[in-house]
Amino acid sequence: MNFVLLALAILSFPLAFAQFGHFFQQGFPFGGGFQQQQQQQEQHAPGRQHKGWTESERVHCRAGYVCPASLACVPTPADCPCPYPEDIKCVIPDNRPRDEGEGPPFVCVRGDTGCAQVLEFSKPI
């Protein structure tokens, strides 16, 4: 009786593997399919996710800097416009020395308060 059960188990293994073998190869990380799928995703995913970074390489800018959000050509990154027309560009007060061509820090805000809230939050504690 034990011999029959053992023989039945051994003979049913190829059938089970034929039925579920693909699942074990592709469904779990140890099957090899996971690595192939991950490598395919890495090949299709660009290194730079922001649309402007890839398109800015095609823009010819003599001023020196292409803004990634708007693709505007400006002399320095601080001169970039806000990405949306309804945004307001607020300069953050900063008295530190800057490198040549480096503009003041800024943030783009939206809403009724304008730059007043930015100035309030930028005060030292």
From Swiss-Prot:
InterPro entries: LCL2 (IPR034543)
Protein name: Long chronological lifespan protein 2
Biased composition (Low complexity): 35-46
Gene behind this protein: LCL2
Signal peptide interval: 1-18
Coiled coil: none
Role of this protein: Probable component of the endoplasmic reticulum-associated degradation (ERAD) pathway.
Region (Disordered): 33-52
Gene Ontology biological-process entries: ERAD pathway
Keyword GTP-binding part of the UniProt annotation: no
Keywords noted in UniProt: Signal
Family: Belongs to the LCL2 family.
